[in-house]
Amino acid sequence: MTIAPMANDLEDFESLLEPDFDAKQFGNDLLKATNNNDTTILDLNTPLKKLNYDLHEIDSRIDQLMNSNPLEIIELIYKNEHVNSTIVGELKPSLGYMNMSYDRLKNQVLDPYERARKVQLALSKVYQTSFLLRGALLYIHLSNKLNALSKTAQLSTSTAINLASLHYQLEITLEENKNLKSLRKIKQLDQDIVSPNKRELITFLSLQMCKECLNSIKIKSNKEIISQLAYSLYLLSSQEFESAINKIVLSNVTMSSQILSKILNSIRMFPDAFNEVVEKGYNIYILETLLQNIKTDNVTNSSRSIAANKSRLGNLLSEYTSMKSKAGSGTPRDLFWSKVSSAFKKDFDISVNRGGPVGKSLLKNKDFIINTMKQSMKKSSDNSDYQSYLDVMLNSVSISLNK
């Protein structure tokens, strides 16, 4: 039995059956079609009549369709029911198996995983809280110890060294637990105790280190104290450590330059004067050796990046050199002899260019000056590495003496 004629019974209403049918757009188009653009009165009766007529027409056609094709309609109904029952019957075992598999997956994997995840999250929070409290207790203990030690007596070198160690431990505690800085108690301790004490301690260590390196006697007899002061200052601030070394070197440069400047008028006294300068250069050599013997492999400085901490060279001399490399001055001896040479060259050139008895005396005694430098510079170091600094000093007089 054919059912093809049924497809044409609603052909006048095909637009209403489209998947993208828009009732608002259809109503708007109907209003436009039944109203005149030239009038200001909106006619709603005509489109309503049109819609009522269409509804009546659809009902009429449905009744006519059912009356004229009852068998086809019944056949379609039974066919759809049969298809539905067939699909359900064939898929039901598979769906049941899938549901059973999912239930087993849910019970054996998903639910235990979710419970484990919640437990892990809770444990993580407990661990974080415990770690934070442990760090806070350690920081408070170290702060109280630092406060008590700083109030026991007048600040001395040994006390300052112990305080520097406590400050370093506080720094490590903060490095290991960044969240400590967010605690109000920690902020208060840092503001009231730690930071003020650290500033005072840095100033004290820097001054003491400069005093201990003031002359040859002190620097030779107090090597251990100087090493401890340098290491403690470095623990507190690598920048202040560098600054203190520079002050020591430049202080010796100033005294050496004054000695050499005064001797230009009496060149026969040059050997004694230059020996004094060499002795100061030897003091810087001792300082350099002390720095080289102080290991920093296990030091972590929060003022540097993690990458910088990992790439350390192993001792205070290499740390100082790496900080000075940007300025181009290198080691303390590099700084000392380059500054002394530069100052002496300036004074020497002025005296030679000015002429007169002093200038003539300098030119006349050029070999004497050079030989004195060569002999004396050997005493500026305990090994043969003085040669490069000898060349630096010879360069300070080479141009003038070649005139």
Curated annotation (Swiss-Prot):
GO cellular component terms attached to this protein's record: cytosol; Golgi membrane; Golgi transport complex
Name of this chain's protein: Conserved oligomeric Golgi complex subunit 5
Keyword Membrane listed: yes
Membrane topology term: Peripheral membrane protein
UniProt subunit comment: Component of the conserved oligomeric Golgi (COG or Sec34/Sec35) complex which consists of eight different proteins COG1-COG8.
Family: Belongs to the COG5 family.
Function statement: Acts as a component of the peripheral membrane COG complex that is involved in intra-Golgi protein trafficking. COG is located at the cis-Golgi, and regulates tethering of retrograde intra-Golgi vesicles and possibly a number of other membrane trafficking events.
Sample GO molecular function, one term: identical protein binding
GO biological process terms on file: cytoplasm to vacuole targeting by the Cvt pathway; intra-Golgi vesicle-mediated transport; retrograde transport, vesicle recycling within Golgi
Additional record remark: Present with 468 molecules/cell in log phase SD medium.
Keyword Membrane: yes
Main location: Golgi
Localization per record: Golgi apparatus membrane
Alphabetical keyword list: Golgi apparatus, Membrane, Protein transport, Transport
Taxonomic source organism: Saccharomyces cerevisiae (strain ATCC 204508 / S288c) (Baker's yeast)
